[in-house]
Regions:
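N-terminal signal-anchor/first transmembrane alpha helix
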Residues: 1-29, 107
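C-terminal transmembrane helix and the adjacent membrane-cytosol boundary/short C-terminal tail
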Residues: 2, 9, 161-176, 188, ...
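Amphipathic cytosolic juxtamembrane alpha-helices at the membrane-cytosol interface
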Residues: 4-5, 78, 104-107, 141-143, ...
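Interhelical loop and adjacent transmembrane-helix boundary motif
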Residues: 4-6, 38, 51-61, 217-264
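Transmembrane alpha-helices
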Residues: 12-24, 115, 150-152, 156-169, ...
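Short membrane-interfacial helix/loop motifs at transmembrane-helix boundaries
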Residues: 25-65, 131, 217, 221-222, ...
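Membrane-interfacial helix termini and adjacent extracytoplasmic/periplasmic loops
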Residues: 49, 122-149, 183, 219-223
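Transmembrane alpha-helix signature in integral membrane proteins
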Residues: 64-97
């Protein structure tokens, strides 16, 4: 009885919250993906797997596979991965640079990093159209990649910076005393200490980049369709909520598989940080 009371007092509120606002909505979306479209924005019986067949490219009318959705999904993973890679290349050294500054300058740099969040996201993305316009016909995919990197770079830098602040630099001195080069000492003594922030930063960057549709709509000019655009169109213009729900679950599955693979690649420590 005492154990039950402790559970209700500690994990109980969190469990109820996750059940009501995470598990239950996901179950509703999954049920929608199995229903039949009856009208614009309406679904009903009977249950069917047609929506899932369409997700994986099977055209029931012509009884053939048209892998358009899978191509869009692959493009989305590719662009999100590139944006995440750019955030790593730019954000990792930036986090070290900020941490190496004086207290006053460090606060200023962090403020400058956070200031964009004070402006509406749409306004910031539209501003990039004005910035890129003088360069003429800017490739749509490159513009989308640039917009994603700009939008999600702070999400990568902040958790990495939090890890860099806790780095024990005495381990670097010990590695150099044992004959390691500066690069080897950094890789062996510093990178493992920043791995928690690196894992968190990659996740916070890749997941929203994979599902975004605003950046590709505005900067891509509807020429670079990503999976987020497909989902948004089903719940908006097309009004096919059943098919949109199936696409949403496909996107969720890809994200979960990607996180699992990244955790495995990062090793046991990365898995613990992810949990």
């Amino acid at each position: 009885m005492l154990t039950l009371r402790r559970f209700l007092a500690t994990l109980g509120p969190g469990t109820v919250w996750l059940t009501l606002f995470l598990v239950l909505p996901l179950l509703i979306v999954f049920v929608y993906s199995l229903l039949t479209r009856t009208d614009v924005g309406q679904v009903g019986l009977p249950f069917t797997l047609e929506n899932w067949q369409r997700v994986f490219g099977y055209d029931a009318l012509f009884e053939e596979f048209v892998p358009d959705n899978l191509q869009v999904l692959w493009r989305s993973v590719w662009v999100a991965g590139l944006a995440t890679g750019l955030c790593v290349l730019l954000g990792y050294p930036l986090a070290f640079y900020i941490a190496a500054q004086s207290e006053r300058r460090r606060r200023l740099l962090l403020l400058l990093l956070i200031i964009p969040f004070w402006t509406n996201f749409l306004i910031r993305i539209y501003a990039w159209i004005i910035i890129l316009r003088p360069f003429g016909l800017f490739p749509s995919t490159l513009a989308v990649l640039l917009g994603m990197t700009y939008a999600y770079l702070p999400f990568f830098v902040l958790p990495v910076y939090a890890s860099v602040e806790k780095v024990d630099w005495r381990l670097v001195e010990a590695a150099e005393d044992l004959g390691a080069t500066p690069a080897r000492a950094f890789w062996a003594a510093v990178v493992p200490q920043t791995l928690p922030g690196l894992v968190a930063g990659v996740i916070l960057t890749f997941v929203p980049a994979l599902g975004t549709f605003v950046v590709s709509d505005i900067l891509g000019g509807a020429k670079t369709a990503l999976v987020g655009n497909l989902v948004q169109n089903q719940f908006g213009q097309s009004g096919d909520w059943a098919y949109g729900s199936a696409l949403s679950f496909l996107l969720l599955a890809v994200v979960l598989i990607g996180l699992w693979l990244y955790a495995r690649a990062a090793g046991q420590r990365g898995l613990e940080d992810l949990a």
